[in-house]
Amino acid sequence: CFEPDMKLIRGIHNLSQAPHGCVLTIGNFDGVHRGHQALLQRLRAEGRQRGLPVVVMIFEPQPLELFAADKAPARLTRLREKLSYLAESGVDYVLCVRFDRRFAALTAQDFISELLVRRLGVQFLAVGDDFRFGAGRQGDFLLLQKAGAEYGFDVTSTQTFCEGGVRISSTAVRQALADDDLVQAENLLGHPFTISGRVVHGDELGRTIGFPTANLPLRRQVSPVKGVYAVEVTGLGDKPLVGVANIGTRPTVAGVRQQLEVHLLDV
């Protein structure tokens, strides 16, 4: 599903698969938008200069989804999509850390000394200046700078990427999608907004209106888009298909679920 050159490391316990020593960034990377892409380009240049691999550390689930699931924003990308975009950006390794209560209890000092220094051997670290980490969110950018001076690694702030006075961020992309401004969303992302998933058998109501229907349950509590859209569908044949998509909720025994229904035209 992603470039063979990029290696996915699932969990800290599998870090022996990665070489010791890296340039590193940490974040959610939701959407892998143009701001993320600019950061990754900068990291690749740093990695080439130092002769070190580029490592991106992400968390699954995202921290807010563990601590306040009802307040967590809609995801722009599933994990599989995120990995694909990161691979296209030239990342060497993605470390996907299982974010659970146990990991969240790790002290800020242990996060630095055990994970960043002992396990990863970080030489260059780029994070947002508002980055918080460790139990109780005790760790911050200043603590990382002090640790860098102590352990011998460089720490830099990820620069805000703006265009036309608009800060390019996952939040800005979500707002554009909420406003049904797909052109602006694509401009911020650097690629069209897509939703992917596995087609499942539905109730075959589509047959009664004369169009085949593809049903994709969305494994997320909330979708960044809802309503009816003209879409292009890939992965069901040799060429893209034209369709009309309806994104909304569907009643289930357990409550409701997010679902994407696509009526395929000219099939």
Protein language model features and the residues they cover:
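Residue-level signal for inorganic ion chemistry
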Residues: 33, 86, 125, 185, ...
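A glycine-rich helix N-cap at a beta->alpha junction
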Residues: 78-94
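Phosphate/ribose-recognition catalytic cores of enzymes acting on nucleotide-derived substrates
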Residues: 202-267
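Short acidic-hydrophobic, aromatic-tinged amphipathic segments that line or gate anion-handling sites
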Residues: 7-14, 74, 95
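N-terminal catalytic cores of NTP/NDP-binding nucleotidyl/phosphoryl-transfer enzymes
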Residues: 15-78
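Classical nucleotidyltransferase
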Residues: 102-212
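Short, Lys/Arg-enriched N-terminal segments with co-localized hydrophobic residues
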Residues: 1-5
